[in-house]
Each structure stands twice: as C-alpha cells, then as structure tokens.
Amino acid sequence: MSKNLLIELGLEELPAYVVTPSEKQLGERLATFLTENRLSFEDIQTFSTPRRLAVRVSGLADQQTDLTEDFKGPAKKIALDADGNFSKAAQGFVRGKGLTTDAIEFREVKGEEYVYVTKHEAGKPAKEVLLGVTEVLSAMTFPVSMHWANNSFEYIRPVHTLTVLLNDEALELDFLDIHSGRVSRGHRFLGTETTITSADSYEADLRSQCVIVDAKERQEMIVEQIKTLEVEQGVQVDIDEDLLNEVLNLVEFPTAFMGNFEAKYLDVPEEVLVTSMKNHQRYFVVRDQAGHLMPNFVSVRNGNDQAIENVIKGNEKVLVARLEDGEFFWREDQKLQIADLVAKLTNVTFHEKIGSLAEHMDRTRVIAASLAKEANLSAEEVTAVDRAAQIYKFDLLTGMVGEFDELQGIMGEKYALLAGEDAAVATAIREHYLPDAAGGALPETKVGAVLALADKLDTLLSFFSVGLIPSGSNDPYALRRATQGIVRILDHFGWRIPMDKLVDSLYDLSFDSLTYTNKADVMNFIRARVDKMMGKAAPKDIREAILASSTFVVPEMLAVAEALVKASHTENYKPAVESLSRAFNLAEKADASVQVDPSLFENEQENTLFAAIQGLTLAGSAAQQLEQVFALSPVINDFFDNTMVMAEDQALKNNRVAILSDLVSKAKTIAAFNQLNTK
C-alpha cells in the first residue's frame, strides 16, 4: 500500500531570491534520491515560505522494487585453472559481488565464454531507505552559506526544525544539529510551535498558524487583494512580475494595503519615485486610469490586518524619507555644471589596472567616431555621437545617482536636457547602458546604439588587455553581458560591420592611457557570444560552419544560421552540402599562387563550372544566397563525374583545384560547408 511522505526544513529567514530556486532544487533532489533508491511514487509537490522549505511525495511505494542484476566477469580461460578449478580471479570476482562460485555460469560473448553471475536483491522497506534522506538536504547548494553557533558545518541559514512524516508516522533522523520530529513553527508573530498531524494535513495545520505554505496560493492572494484595492480606489496598480515574485517570498501570510504620500513629490521625475518605491521599499506603484503616477503605493504586510492603520503610517513615514532625499538631490543636482562633473571624472577610477573613467571615455569617443562612419550615420548623428561620448558618464557624480545608482543614465538624460543638450545626445546618455540584462531592451536610436557599442567595446578590450578575462562561470565585470549586447545591437540595427576588421582597426589605435592586447582572445570571446546567439535555434554543426566562414558580419551570420536551419529540412540539402563539402575538401590542396587558366580545360564540365562560379554574385538575402550556392550542386557533381581533379599532370591538377578554390572562396563567405553534418 502506498503512502505519502512529508519533509519540512524550518530555517531562519531566507533571502527572497533564494526561496523559489531552493524549493525547486529540494523537489528535484528528492525525486532523484527516490528514483536511485528504487522507490516509486506518483507525484511530488513542493512548498516554501521565507522560513521553510518543504516537499510532499504522494503515492510512495511501501518498499523498494526488487533488483536483479547480471555481472560479467573474466573470460573462462582466465576463470579456470589447468585442473578446471576456479582461479583466484574468478573467486575474487564473485566475492566482490557478495556471492560464491556456486553462482557462476558461463555465457558466450562474440565467440568467447565469460563468467557471469546473477545477483538478486530484495527491496527494503521504504522506512529503512528513508533514513538516508538527509543526504538530499546535505547536498543542497546555495549562492551563500553561513556558520552558526559553534558548529563546523555551513548552510544557507540556521536550521531550527526538521519534520519527516510517512503518513502520520514521524521518522527519526538527524540532520546537522537537529533531530527530526513532527514539530513545525507557525507565523513568527501570529503563530506558535505546532504539531503536524500527518503528511496530508500539512497545509491545513500551518494555515491555522497563519502560514500559507503554497507559494502559488500566496501569489494569488496578493494579486487578488491588489485587484480589490484597485476597484475600491478606482486606480491601476503596476503588478511588476519580478517584484511580485520577490514579495511573495518575503511573507508567510500576505495582507496588501494602500498608503499615501504628498502630491508635491510628483514634481520629482517619475523614475526617482518608482525606484524609491519599487527597488528600495518593495512597494507597488499606483497610477490613475490614464496611466499617470498617483501619490499612493501598495505594500504587502507579513501578517493579518490587525492594527493595519499603524502599519500604513509606518510605511508612509519610511517612504517619505526616501522621497525627501530624491527631492533634495533633484533640486541640488540642477545647480551643477556638466563640464565641472566631466572634469572630475579624471579622479574616478574605472578599474585600478585600467585607469580613470575619463580615460575610458576618451577611448570610447575615438571608437564611437569610427563606428559612426561604419554605420553610415548622418552628419548630425555623427556630431551627436561625439558630444555624447564627451560627457556620457557625468551623472555618476550627481547626488541622485550616488544615492540611487539604478538611475545612472536615466538621470544623465534628464540633467542633459535641462542643461540644453541636444535631445539625441541626452537619449544616447541613457541608452548607452542598454541592454542592461540578458534579453533586455536595446537602444532605439542610432546615436545611442553607436555609443553603447563603443562603450562596451572599450570595456571588453580594456579588461582583456590587463588579463581580467572571464573564466568558467566567473564574470565579475559582466563582460559576457557586454559582448552579448554588442552582438544584439549589431543584429538589431542590421549594421554589416565586419567584426574582425573592426577589432583589427581598434588594435591599431594608440592611447596614452592603455595599449590593447590579447586580440585573439577577444575575437574568440566575441565568436562565443555569436555562437550562443545562434544556439537558440541552430544545431552545433551549423553554428560551427558559420563561425568558420570567411565573413564575420553579425547580422549576416545570424541570418545564415536561420536560412541553413530551414534548408536542412529540404530534400536538396543533403546532396548540395555533400557536393560542396567535396569541393571544400579538395580546395584545401590548392596552391594559392595558381590562377585558373581556361586554356587548360579538357572538357565542357570544367568550362561550365568555371562560368557558373564567375556568374555567382551572392546577392539578396541569406536564404537567396544559399539558394544560389545550392543551385550549383548539379554542376559541381557533373564536374566531378567527368573530371579527374587529382590528375597526374601537375598543371591540370593545379588548374582544376584552382577552379574549386574559386568556388570555395565565394561559398565560404556564407559558411564552411564541409563542417555541416548530413548523416
């Protein structure tokens, strides 16, 4: 008869960002443990709050399934001695399996007999197997861990309780310094220690102690309560998904409420108010029906609505202190001069091994000028890029950004506009940080995009030049994100800037502040980001073929990846790739100094292929170019069927290989077709 298993780990308050992944990890690790230990089950449900991680297994088998395994041993000629007795090798083999030589039988494998034994292991009761379940808890990994009391071990937070129930029976286990039982803890203020009656009563037992253990239910409660406030107050609440996920992991019993602040603070830029509420206080922003910011906020209390008025007043008081700071910095920063702030950037360190922010900006300005030409910007846009590059970090020295660093760039745009800077310049100051996350928003203007590229390129080259290169998962300076941003921006704007030539030109630049080095590593790093971008849809062989092409133009490479993926599902893909691959492989033997001499042609097929190559313009989209190359497949095959490429006559051989080399030089601008897999 199956049973239900409950495991709850009671801890000190967990960081909100750890709760959900830890809940998931616990469920996955327990499922693996049960599977590896041959305990079947029907379902696993996980639970979490800031003070507990729990999992319930439904339909758990009473005992392990029996195990029957065959083991292959030494060959018969080794297993038997000259007298036909079992050798030490055979005896040692069966002894290692916990058996005797009576269990030995011989089986033929590929014409030779080998020792085989069959071992039968009866399944153990589930209760006995579950005594080892603490290894699941011990194996849990966390971003940070800590010691407590005089213990030598580490965990995410101090552990207070461990509840392990098989139906209504408490299993006795030891984990760290805790002995398991059926005692759990209710809400920190509204509950007490409580007894969990059974695995099935878990949610109800803790609900009576003002703890909602199901994270999804807490989320639904929060959303429903906010929706009720919206209707009652006639407003709209920005239910930011990331904030919602954070807040639900800060509370065990959620109660949403609305607070207010003075309307005078609405004169401060909206971004300042939103940052104060959302990022610093974990409040939800309130708007009117037209979408305008209201002097209100919604917060979620960890508790019921008892004395909620006092809670509201306390939250309002804390927020007003933040808003006062914002209002003060907004007023005082407007008295500052951009030129003065830029001058002070010479004293701000970009990185101790690289130099100052001012030096970083100087290099960025030079790179931006080069990129502006490559991107065919207008004269007005070139001027805007240059001006933006001169000042774009000035807001880092304002009081507002010093207090609210999330507003860097955003406040730069606003202060630049107030100072009379061109709108394109101001926008570029904000956009140069984009994208600021994987999949984040990209710059919308060409000026902002060029500045973003230049800033990221100098950052990448500078850190690589001083040996600060990401390794493994370690990337403290977010160089992978910056490089991914470079790739995404180039693709978004369709700028066909050859990255290899661009990087070469940057390494030719001379700066007093820094000399760029490690070019090969930089190029490989950029290739890896392009590979990752293609990897969303393209298999490995297609990615490798494109990365081995003679073209390093990001938009074209990504377009070719898409075209090849689509083409790989067509009938002519395999024969076309195979004929091109043959040409590629033979072209590797080409003498680069040999030019095709039509007077040496001995058959019509040579003439036809050469003419087709000469007429190959590779115009249009990536799909159209691929179609043009694939269309040569019959001509290539006809050439191979009627021509001995590796002729004994050296002149003929060189000439024919040169024909193929001409083909490859054009086709390789798309991909190295011999890297593609047609099996």
Curated annotation (Swiss-Prot):
Question: InterPro entries under this entry?
Answer: Gly-tRNA-synth_bsu, Gly-tRNA-synth_heterodimer
Q: Which domain of life is it from?
A: Bacteria
Write out the similarity annotation: Belongs to the class-II aminoacyl-tRNA synthetase family.
NCBIfam families recorded for this chain? glyS
Q: Which UniProt keywords apply?
A: Aminoacyl-tRNA synthetase, ATP-binding, Cytoplasm, Ligase, Nucleotide-binding, Protein biosynthesis
Which is a GO BP term held by this UniProt record? glycyl-tRNA aminoacylation
Assigned EC number: 6.1.1.14
Q: Which residues form the signal peptide?
A: none
One MF annotation (Gene Ontology) recorded for this entry: ATP binding
Summarize subunit and interaction data from the UniProt record for this chain: Tetramer of two alpha and two beta subunits.
Q: Which gene encodes it?
A: glyS
Compartments reported by the entry: Cytoplasm
**Reactions mediated catalytically:** tRNA(Gly) + glycine + ATP = glycyl-tRNA(Gly) + AMP + diphosphate
Could you state one GO cellular component term attached to this entry? cytosol
Q: What is its main location?
A: cytoplasm
Q: Which organism is it from?
A: Streptococcus pyogenes serotype M28 (strain MGAS6180)
* Enzyme category, top tier: ligase
Protein's name according to its UniProt entry? Glycine--tRNA ligase beta subunit
